Amino acid sequence: VVGGDECNINEHRFL
C-alpha cells in the first residue's frame, strides 16, 4: 500500500 512519506517511514520501521 502506498500512502506517502509517512507510509514509507512506517514500512521501513516494520522491516
Swiss-Prot record:
Q: What class of enzyme is it?
A: hydrolase
In which tissues or organs does this protein occur? Answer: Expressed by the venom gland.
Q: What name goes with this protein?
A: Snake venom serine protease
- Tell me if Hydrolase is a UniProt keyword of this record: yes
Origin: domain of life: Eukaryota
User: Its biological function?
Assistant: Snake venom serine protease that may act in the hemostasis system of the prey.
List GO terms (cellular component aspect). extracellular region
Organism field: Bothrops cotiara
